[in-house]
Amino acid sequence: MRNAGYQVFKQVFTLAKSISPLEFKEKTEEKRGLTLANYSSYLVNINRLLFWKILPGGEEYLSREEIKHLPVEKKGELFRGWIEENCKDLTFLNLSKAGLTYLPPEICQLSQLQELDLRENQLTALPTEIGQLSELQYLYLNQNQLTALPAEIGRLSQLEWLDLNQNQLTSLPAEIGWLPQLQWFYLNQNQLTSLPAEIGQLSKLQVLYLNQNQLTALPTEIGQLSELTRLFLTQNQLTSLPPETGQLSQLQYLFLNQNQLTSLPAEIRQLSNLLQLHLGQNQLTALPTEIGQLSQLQTLDLNQNQLTALPIEIGQLSQLRALELNQNQLTSLPAEIGRLSKLQWLGLSQNQLTALPAEIGQLSQLQWLYLSQNQLTSLPTEIGQLSQLQWLELNQNQLTALPAEIGQLSKLTKLELAENPLKDIAEKIRQRFRL
């Protein structure tokens, strides 16, 4: 840990030499006889200079003869007054990739700031003064090393966009719920194990990203996010969803891939505006019959689960375009699957299907059908009715023959049949697909 701290200081020290070269001439960090006290002081002042250099007119001011000869400490003392005189009306500030390890408290003087970009620095904490930016609407803090947020973050009453992706946050302060205008909240790739109940107070929140954290559960208050349209929870450790999830009446996109879900609550039926539901790589053994009530659903991803059957209610998903069921344990499909009149993509590879229902032929919009690695011994003649089919994968099954009706599929451009014990293929099919 000490070595890591030294490396950070060494990097900042190097930056300081470029900003205040005369002071550092013929000196090294060893010769300065650093103590913890002057280490901290230098760190603060060096970050002030890095900050100052980026402010409008800052670099020009620091280049003046009477200024550049001053010690770092003296420049630091001038910083507050200079900001007050030159930057109090600033509304936008880009400090991304500035090499900052510390955000100077003078940030609070930029009282008119509406957008602050601090992405790709090395910040481990924020000053409490951040809460004084009462006009701030957009705050970018992604790709830093933040381990916590100050409670004062809750004072940013105008904040609409908060990006904290790729930090090291393990928790959020309760005050996060005090952001009445927040609409977009990004928390991907942190180390969050839970969310505060107060997150439910974000009444205007529309988008919430929580991918790649360590969440094991969601608070019941999540259901209070009445304006939420997108919820991303991929790569967490969720074992269940609270029934209150069903109260997210405006939700359109729900991503839950790569969790440990074993079931879904019946309340999922209440998500009447849901367009996409992603549940791949979980441990689902069955779907609730209520899933059929998702009347607007267009994409349903259930890849890599442990499903052995589908409820007949699956046929009620009248708007479904894509159904992903690869790598499950399905032995059959319900006849009702034929009612999915808008389905374009059907993935069924790596299951245990021995037959397809005749109703498969009713999928008049189907373009892609994946059936590799099953135990199919035959195909229904109705497969020839799939007039829009372009791609048909049947590798690694037990097919000994193909129905001649496959020759009727005028739009079919790809037919894969490898590793089947085929004995009889109609000449028309053989010639067309060069089998």
Name every feature range the model reports, one short phrase each.
Residues 110-111:
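Short, solvent-exposed loop/edge-beta patches enriched in aromatic
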Residues 1-105, 115, 124, 128, ...:
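The feature captures the LRR N-terminal capping module
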